């Protein structure tokens, strides 16, 4: 099983790490970190070589090399951006592996896709659950004058800096909240009631939607680079 990781591979070094397909088939596991992530960040960094095509040639090189040792069936698999990589790998090198199994792999139609917002607003979960999420977002906006100082202090304590005013970051974080909640599968019953105190609301808000995503210290510079320059074209 070849895992086409879309990000860093550090978590796969844990002794107890197991990937679903290798466990099901009792198969050998090869875990490939995406270039420019984790330990695969070059120094000095030249972003010109961070392309989808180059990442697929990385996988091709790994697979063709290891096939000299392992000549049985091969499965490529990945999750999210890694799932995208599984699909792209199959497209570029259709004969490298026998089976491709992408999980939750988005296929972007453009830089701004446009399908996410209607889905979150009208289709995900139940109308009652969607309303509870929306009510929380509205409450956090209504209390902005009281919660914004807490938000600003939190970001300052974390050392976050932004290229836009902190009040706008707050608003973006509120908008991001619904996507983050559904993405990570947070139970709706974990959302505080709208009459909860400021501290309770703020604690939940930050736990679900960490503002480092918008900061200049974003932990995903490589993701931002490849998403803007290459993934939008696929």
Region roles according to the model:
Residues 83-94:
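Short glycine-enriched nucleophile-adjacent loop
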Residues 1-6:
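Short beta-strand element of the alpha/beta-hydrolase
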């Amino acid at each position: 099983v070849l895992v086409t990781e879309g990000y860093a591979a550090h978590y796969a070094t844990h002794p107890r790490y197991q990937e679903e397909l290798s466990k099901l088939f009792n198969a050998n596991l090869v875990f490939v970190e995406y270039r420019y992530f984790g330990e695969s960040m070059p120094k000095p960094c030249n972003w010109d070589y961070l392309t989808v095509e180059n990442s697929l040639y990385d996988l091709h090189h790994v697979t063709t090399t290891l096939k000299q040792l392992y000549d049985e069936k091969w499965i490529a698999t990945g999750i999210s951006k890694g799932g995208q990589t599984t699909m792209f790998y199959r497209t570029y090198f259709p004969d490298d592996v026998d089976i491709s199994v992408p999980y939750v792999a988005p296929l972007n139609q453009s830089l701004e896709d446009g399908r996410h917002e209607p889905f979150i607003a009208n289709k995900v979960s139940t109308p009652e659950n969607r309303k509870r999420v929306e009510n929380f977002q509205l409450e956090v906006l209504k209390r902005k004058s009281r919660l914004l100082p807490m938000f600003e202090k939190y970001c300052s304590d974390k050392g976050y800096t932004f290229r836009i005013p902190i009040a706008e970051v707050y608003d973006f974080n509120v908008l991001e909240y619904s996507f983050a909640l559904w993405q990570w599968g947070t139970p709706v019953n974990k959302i505080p009631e709208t009459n909860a105190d400021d501290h309770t609301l703020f604690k939940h808000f930050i736990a679900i939607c960490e503002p480092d995503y918008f900061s200049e210290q974003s932990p995903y510079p490589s993701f931002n680079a490849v998403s803007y320059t290459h993934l939008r074209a696929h």
